Regions:
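Conserved strand-to-loop turn within each blade of WD40 beta-propeller repeats
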Residues: 27-30, 86-89, 129-131, 222-225
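Per-blade loop-tip surfaces of WD-repeat and WD-like beta-propellers in eukaryotic adaptors/scaffolds
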Residues: 1-9, 32-64, 68, 88-105, ...
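Canonical WD40 repeat/beta-propeller blade segments in eukaryotic WD-repeat proteins
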Residues: 10-17, 62-76, 112-120, 199-210
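Conserved loop/turn motif of beta-propeller repeat scaffolds
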Residues: 21, 80, 123-124, 211-216
Length: 245
């Protein structure tokens, strides 16, 4: 069965299926995030209305949320009770749905470049990747309030390399990489490569947990630098309890 969902006024950049498989969230460049019904009568004979109160016909919107810029990413929590969507204005919005259908929304602004992909590790933690070239971690406290926690990829504090140990070939390669990946005229010093795993914007981030698991402790990111990086969260120096893992 193939059907068209109408109502978007510009490009749809990302979509995310609700865990129940009956609701779709969309991220659109018309500054809107929409939650729409994807119930197909010929297929879904007994649709579960939770947590949206009632079951609506295919294509009808349950909710429409506004953002201060293009909506660049969207994701559902494992339980399906939390929706996260990111804006080009360096904000992430967290929408909480309770079983009665009531909705509450929180906006988190962060002083970094915007993200273009989101994934939940648990109902208490979400990771975003984008133009900062470094995955960003956001967590919820015991009262359900979200905030920015840290970058996932933190700079190593190991011993510095000697400046004179870098060959002229390595210096030339570093300068070329700086020009092509970041638009810089120089690399900021011979041999001073980026310390992050990615050298350009992250375009997608995916959880690598088992289907149906309430948590995910492993994820992958891919970027415009041509790299695919696998992250084992327990091996990083990060508070696992804060992540709900």
């Amino acid at each position: 069965v193939s059907k068209l969902i109408k109502g978007h006024k510009s490009t749809v950049q990302k979509v995310a299926w609700h865990p129940n498989g009956l609701v779709l969230a969309t991220a659109c460049t018309d500054f809107k995030c929409r939650v729409v019904s994807a119930v197909v009568e010929e297929v879904d004979t007994n649709p579960d209305p939770r947590p949206f109160g009632t079951v609506k016909p295919f294509g009808e919107a349950y909710h429409q949320f506004s953002c201060g810029g293009w909506v660049t990413a969207v994701a559902w929590s494992p339980s399906g009770s939390i929706l996260a969507y990111a804006g080009q204005d360096s904000t992430i919005h967290f929408v909480h749905f309770d079983h009665s259908g009531a909705v509450s929304e929180q906006r988190v602004r962060y002083a970094l470049l915007p993200v273009s992909s989101l994934v939940f590790l648990s109902d208490k933690a979400v990771v975003g990747g984008g133009h900062d070239m470094n995955p960003l971690v956001f967590t919820a406290n015991s009262s359900g309030q979200w905030s920015f926690l840290r970058r996932l990829d933190e700079k190593s504090t190991g011993p510095a390399k000697a400046e004179g140990a870098v060959s002229s070939m390595s210096a030339a390669r570093a300068m070329f990489q700086a020009k092509t990946t970041r638009g810089q005229a120089s690399s900021g010093g011979a041999g001073k490569d980026l310390w992050t795993q990615h050298a350009n914007a992250i375009v997608d981030i995916e959880g690598m947990g088992r289907a149906g698991d309430p948590t995910c402790s492993k994820l992958s990111t891919c970027g415009l630098d041509g790299r695919l990086v696998v992250w084992e969260i327990p091996t990083l120096d990060i508070d696992m309890q804060a992540l709900g893992l």
